Amino acid sequence: MNIYDELGIPKLINAVGTYTVVGGTRMSEETLRDLCDAARSFAEVEKLQDILNRKTAELTNNEAALLCNSCSCAIYLATAACVARHYGKNFNNLTAEEISRCEVVALWGQHIPYDHAMEQLGVKIRFVGFPNMQAEMSHSVVKDAINSNTVMCYFAPRTPDGYYGEGCMNLSDFISIAHSCNIPVLADGAAQLPPKHNLWRFTRDMGADMACFSGGKDLCGPQASGLLLGKLELLKIATELSFPRYGCGRIMKIGREEMVALYSAIRQYVNADEEARLQWCENEVKKLVSNLAECKHFSAERTWPNQAGQPLPRAFVTLKSETTTPAQLRDILRNGNPGIICYSENRPGVYINPMCLADGEMEQIIARLKEIDQQLQ
């Protein structure tokens, strides 16, 4: 009996992807071993942090890195670093009034719940443009929003087929506009892995001053971990404000276990075979599509990319029953044995995303869908 059995918590097959609400991802056995090794012995946290940050920067081709407890934490600390840079003094010596005068420029079409991390610091977000408008945005819209109180420009990179419309402007132009006004840019790439080259593409190749990523998504680190990468000047400030030091980042504690495990996961990730992983996902999708071909109430097709714009395939299973809704199908799958969690995204069926599946789980999904097919009227 494992801990979930003891607690009476049903284990699920994750067919949605790296969503926090279902636990994000799985750590590898190597990562789990490194996490346990870190837990068994004490270490000076600041010394451990310095070494892990330096090695992570080397692995990701960045000037500097900071391992923290979430991507939201990375956004918060990046913003604090930019506020400190703006005033040219220690953030911890600033007044609430001084912080409240600071502004971050962002795009309306990228307004997401996670940008509250910046507002929690006390700064204001100045949104420009229109939400999800499928039209080209003028560069002057962004440039005119930058003023003497602007400390940072925030951008959430996505592919055109991902969350946001093309009207949001591209990252290269956004960086160019911000830098023409001497304002640093944070690229929020929380779920923008794969491809792994995004770990250095946004910063080293495209010029963003900082980029942040979730550690608990495709990096396959601990769920409570995040990564901030970028310019040494800003990362040095962010590190000085982070745990275990006193100040605004003290509340965002990350244990030695999570730091070591995240570093281990990153090391494995940058050395992994992306093509082999892509081919595995393609094979899983083909397996589902071919096995549902004879079903009466289901048909399946390959879709691309996935919901976060990541370059990985999914399958969409169309529900052809007139007596069962997609919501009911999701409930049947979630409450079955095995429990399978999947989303519909306002379409007449369910998506099956292979990115978090283990070997053999697609076969269980296929068997369950065939069983449901026999039961539907």
Write out the residue ranges for each language-model feature:
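Conserved PLP-dependent catalytic core of the aminotransferase class-I/II
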Residues: K55, L59, V270-W304
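Conserved PLP-enzyme active-site core in the AAT-like
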Residues: M1-R26, N53-V270, V289-A293, L319, ...
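A common structural junction motif
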Residues: R245-Y246, R334-I341, L369-Q377
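A glycine-/small-polar-enriched, mobile loop at the entrance of the PLP active site in fold-type I
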Residues: I13-I51
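Short strand->helix junction
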Residues: F42, P160-D161, A358-D359
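Conserved C-terminal alpha-helix-loop-beta "cap" of PLP-dependent enzymes
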Residues: I3, N291-A367
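Glycine-rich phosphate/diphosphate-binding loops and the adjacent beta-loop-alpha structural elements
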Residues: Q268-E274, V350, M355
